[in-house]
């Protein structure tokens, strides 16, 4: 029986899938792949605002019933997948549904995984060359890889429907909510996890108020449910290795000093908030 639902969100290309797979080794914790639950909420929210029979209900009755319907539905969804007591639902979309998630359970916690934007951009760039069959564009339907590099670096961060641009756009709202509820949020930098994975996980367990679990970094389990990346038709890759490897920053070898500076200047608030040492 699911006793507690938590959320994993943040930015793409941050090793969130890997961290979820590591946590999934714990017999008390079930972690999802990319979770579709936010889309159920979106559909219910939309229909309950359109259909007369919903709107005819007393506002408070509708609110209570609506929240309880979603709360019980999410519980039932995950209990069909696992008998573990703690569930981590991974989706960047959760950042757009905080009034909902706090209404479901104010005790839920939010693991927010971030990374230097320059390395996220480098990761996307390498995926576009690794999978040339993927048709990736910035909304204008022109081949994205043919656009000038300065344009690409800007569009990754500013296109609000893109894999990085959308969660980056909602991040200030996320931080506002996190400041109001500091014990509910844990900001995990990819760089910290990369340098000190065991310490990072110990800190996560402490924050979750769970006993520490000694993970085997040489035998990282696969996700319980395989995720078919081709479906997304985008620069997405969720396969992880079975051994934890330390990564070196990519951007110093890939970007010029001018390009690196442009990413920082275009996203100054991000670097001031999370990576002031890069300024």
Model-identified regions with their sequence ranges:
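PAPS-dependent sulfotransferase catalytic domain
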Residues: 66-77, 122-207
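PAPS-dependent sulfotransferases, especially Golgi type II membrane carbohydrate sulfotransferases
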Residues: 1-6, 157-161, 175-179, 206-279
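Conserved phosphate-donor/acceptor-positioning beta-strand/loop module used by diverse small-molecule
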Residues: 90, 101-126
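Short catalytic/ligand-binding loop motif for oxyanion handling, primarily in non-cytosolic enzymes
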Residues: 17-20, 38-41, 95-98, 118-123, ...
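Hydrophobic/aromatic beta-strand patches that form the interior of the parallel beta-sheet core
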Residues: 6, 30, 109-112, 186-188
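PAPS-dependent sulfotransferase catalytic core
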Residues: 1-73, 81, 129, 141-144, ...
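PAPS/PAP-binding and catalytic site of the sulfotransferase fold
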Residues: 15-29, 101-105, 187-212
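Glycine-rich phosphate-binding loop used to anchor ATP phosphates in small-molecule kinases
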Residues: 70, 74-97
């Amino acid at each position: 029986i699911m006793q507690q639902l938590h959320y994993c969100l943040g930015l793409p290309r941050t090793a969130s899938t890997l961290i979820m797979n590591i946590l999934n080794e714990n017999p008390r914790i079930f972690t999802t792949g990319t979770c579709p639950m936010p889309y159920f909420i979106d559909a219910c929210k939309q229909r309950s605002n359109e259909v007369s029979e919903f709107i005819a209900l007393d506002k408070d009755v509708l609110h209570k019933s609506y929240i309880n319907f979603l709360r019980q539905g999410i519980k039932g969804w995950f209990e069909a997948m696992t008998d573990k007591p703690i569930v981590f639902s991974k989706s960047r979309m959760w950042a757009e549904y905080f009034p909902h998630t706090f209404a479901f359970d104010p005790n839920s916690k939010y693991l927010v995984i971030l990374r230097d934007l320059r390395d996220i951009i480098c990761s996307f760039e390498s995926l576009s060359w690794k999978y040339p069959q993927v048709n990736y564009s910035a909304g204008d339907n022109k081949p994205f890889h043919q656009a000038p590099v300065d344009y690409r670096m800007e569009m990754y961060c500013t296109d609000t429907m893109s894999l990085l641009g959308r969660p980056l756009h909602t991040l200030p709202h996320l931080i506002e909510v996190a400041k109001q509820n500091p014990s509910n949020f844990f900001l995990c930098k990819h760089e910290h996890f990369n340098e000190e994975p065991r310490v990072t996980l110990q800190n996560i367990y402490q924050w979750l108020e769970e006993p520490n679990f000694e993970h085997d970094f040489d035998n990282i389990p696969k996700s319980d449910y395989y995720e078919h990346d081709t479906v997304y038709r985008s620069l997405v890759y969720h396969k992880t290795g079975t051994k934890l490897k330390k990564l070196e920053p990519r951007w110093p070898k890939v970007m010029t000093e001018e390009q690196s500076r442009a990413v920082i200047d275009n996203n100054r608030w991000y670097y001031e908030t999370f990576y002031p040492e890069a300024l």
